[in-house]
Amino acid sequence: MVQAAFSPVGPTLGDAIPGFGTDGIRGRVGSVVTPALCLQVGYWVGRVLAVEGPVLIGMDSRTSGSMVASALTAGLTAAGREVWNLGLCPTPAVPLLIRKFGAAGGLMVSASHNPPADNGIKVFGANGAKLAPERQARIEAGLRGEIDHSDHDHSLCAGLRQSSDLMADYRELLLSAVGSHRLDGVPIVLDLCWGSATACAADAFQALGADLTVLHGEPDGSRINVGCGSTALGPLQEAVKERGAVMGFAFDGDADRMLAVDGRGRIVDGDHVMFLWGSVLQEQQALPDQRLVATVMSNLGFQRAWEQRGGILERTPVGDQHVHAAMVASGAALGGEQSGHILAASHGLCGDGVLTALQLSTLCHAKGITLGDWLDRSFQPFPQKLVNVTVPSQARRKAWSSCEPLVAAIRSAEETMGSDGRVLVRASGTEPLVRVMVEAADASLVDHWADHLASVVDQSLNAA
């Protein structure tokens, strides 16, 4: 195995590299996401992509985005790849434009719902899907200095094209997805969370005639996700009720996911979106095998209600790339995550928060009902509680399933709740957290076991 101290763009990083987590490379800028890392990632992405052609780069509004994108661009062009810089855009714009223009791949500079001090890199292949695990592994091998690069002609550098004009194509794709549906005069509130959604969401809803109120509607890298957006729905709920709106939509930092609220401020999460949209597709006989694809985080109430409609709910590990893979394998038309990532085969299997919001609002308007009416016809979720426990040690987070006190506590919880409850413990792929989720028909059991298991995680994995 080659152990190269240097690649053509500088020192390799050895074992001190962040790997591809649940959604790309992500971490604190300056300690994890550094210019040196981004330069090397750009170079090795350029080397590893399977086809010829330009590489697209987009970013959310984080202050560090320009640094990350510039370093990635330097690496990509050193690898001989022409770069098209989209500027501020939602994550889904990258894969959609990759396919539209036949690009070799793309990168999105974003840390999604993470705090402003973090940033990250998502990588897409020529098909618009997240890069396959074997190609991610090859990039990581390059970062560690384990790939021989002597056969590459490093004089063949490429150039940079500023391509923010391509966002007009993305906006057209959004509007074409809802066809002739309109929203004339419908009062709607959008929380754009100072992030990527500011590039297109308000324009799209206004083009359809909505009576629009916009919160946090300018790009602001120091406030992205801070007390707003899909991770903090309070401002949206208050604004919807104060303004008498019939619905509201909140996006995360890179706008690949969305959560909604109805006119009373009730939350419509990804499970409800899949159930409601899936029911429409079922009625239209446009849902192969009556199948929806969701993750292990989706609610048991959702699963049982969907099965009562004669449907199949297929579950995957957490991460929209797993949902995507399962949908491709089974031919499913709709899938997603409780957190608000929704993937539709009719829209390229790409999680798009703005598009999902447009679909929900236009479907409601076309049916002559409110989102609240639709929610009333949906399912009753089981009580569910998610507790995030900070565990700084990555090694301990990854080894949680070998912790005997925790395994024993999980077993006790499962035996107590039986078939009317479940426990899910997992290490976050994007943050230094172990997530504990408990759901059951009995809310008191949920509270007891979620708190108890979180305490066991803290005491066992953070012990000196």
From Swiss-Prot:
Binds 1 Mg(2+) ion per subunit. Keywords: Isomerase, Magnesium, Metal-binding, Phosphoprotein. GO terms for molecular function: magnesium ion binding; phosphoglucosamine mutase activity; phosphomannomutase activity. Gene3D superfamilies: Alpha-D-Glucose-1,6-Bisphosphate, subunit A, domain 3, Alpha-D-phosphohexomutase, C-terminal domain. It comes from the Bacteria. Mg(2+) binds at S112, D252, D254, D256. It catalyses: alpha-D-glucosamine 1-phosphate = D-glucosamine 6-phosphate. One of its GO terms (cellular component) is cytosol. Its cofactor is Mg(2+). The modification Phosphoserine is found at S112. Activated by phosphorylation. The keyword Metal-binding applies. Belongs to the phosphohexose mutase family. This is Phosphoglucosamine mutase. The gene is glmM.
